[in-house]
Each structure stands twice: as C-alpha cells, then as structure tokens.
Amino acid sequence: VFNIESRVHGSRGIPGDWRNTKEHGGGMVLDWGVHLIDQILMMLSERKLISLYATLSFVTNEAVDDGFKILLNYDDGLTCHIEVGTSNFINLPRWYIQGENGTAIIEDWNLNGKIVMVSDWEKRDAVPVVTAAGLTKTMAPRTSETIKEYPLPSVHSDIKDYYRNVFKAIEGKEEIFVKHNEVMRSMRLMEAVMCSAHENRVVFFKDSQLRWE
C-alpha cells in the first residue's frame, strides 16, 4: 500500500450550534478531524510520520473552518490524504486505497465497494483508447483477463466496547484501551494542521510522539 485516502463529505455546511463558534471548539478539524486523524494514526501506528501539509476551507463560515484537507507523508513513502467537506453535493468515496498490485474502494458508511487486483502482469500490451488528443495506451483500461474483483471483507465491531472498557477500567478490572500518549499524538497533529494551514507551510515532526517546530 502506498496511498490511503479518507474522506467524509456533506452538503449542509456547519450546523447552527457549538460547531460554528470558535470559542466553543467549533470547526471541522475539531469536530470530524479528530476522529479521522485518530483512525489513521491507529492504523499506521508502526510507521514513522515525517511531515504534514494542510489547508482549511471557509466557504460557509468565516469564524471556523467548514472543511479541511491534510496530506501526511511517512518515511517509507506512504502518503495519506484526510479530507472533510461540508459543501460537497457529490460525495467522493469514504475510502480509497492504492497498492502495488491493486486498489480498494469503500463508497459509503454501508461498506459498498470492492477490491480490484492484478491477476496477470504478463499481458502488458494494452489496446489504445481514443481521446480528444488522439490515441493513448497510458490510460487504456485493463482487460478483464488481467484483473480480478473481490468483495470487501466484513469486520465485526461494537462501538459499545469502548464504553464497557471505560467502566471496567474505573472499576480496576481492565486496563484502559485509549492511552494518554495516543490522545496526545492526535492533539499534536491537530495543532500541526492549524499551524500548517494558517502559515501555509509544511510541518516536520521530530519524533514518534509528533512533536514539531
């Protein structure tokens, strides 16, 4: 896997409550961003994050961000794109993942999607397609005999497990799932997002705890 894209899109702007007030923690970075960022950090916890670049949008609200785009770069060449938009009347896929031998797509919250993988690397001679600029082989689609489609795997989960763990941790029966250092990493990354967007610069991380300058 060399690229992961995680998106959540809507078309209603920011709701008229605390989400559109800066002093109450409003804006999409703090509302949705914290969840998508934490998700990526947990998925890629064994990889080293080296830099970040982010932009914020203010289409429907000047006080707080109503959307954002974050590009994460890892030391092994992996890139991650995290995006939230509230002025999207046509949604892009919830997940889009590229690997050397295939691509996976998850369209929505209902896990509609598929995995397409190369089944034959030997048949390389593509049939040219006609474009406005003429013939091209570069963007010619693969033929059915060189790729294979797979369904998305189903993974069972229960959001209540988190709350059960908090209850048992308070009782001293279990160790807490979410550690303080994991929370701190997410908070530091969100601060780096704000810095990158406001100063229009790449933020470089100094260590695995995502300290930055």
Can you annotate each of these PLM segments?
Residues 158-162, 190-199:
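Stable alpha-helical structural segments in soluble proteins, enriched in small hydrophobic residues
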Residues 41, 71, 163-167, 184, ...:
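Non-transmembrane alpha-helical segments in soluble domains
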Residues 1-61, 200:
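Predominantly a Rossmann-like dinucleotide-binding segment in NAD(P)-dependent oxidoreductases
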Residues 62-68:
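A short, glycine/Asx- and small/polar-enriched loop/turn
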Residues 101-181, 203, 209-213:
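C-terminal glycine/acidic-rich active-site capping loop/insertion
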Residues 34, 61, 83-91:
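Glycine-rich phosphate/pyrophosphate-binding beta-alpha loops
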Residues 70-77, 97-99:
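Active-site beta-strand termini and strand-to-loop segments that position acidic
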Residues 1-2, 195-213:
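C-terminal capping/lid region of NAD(P)-dependent oxidoreductase domains
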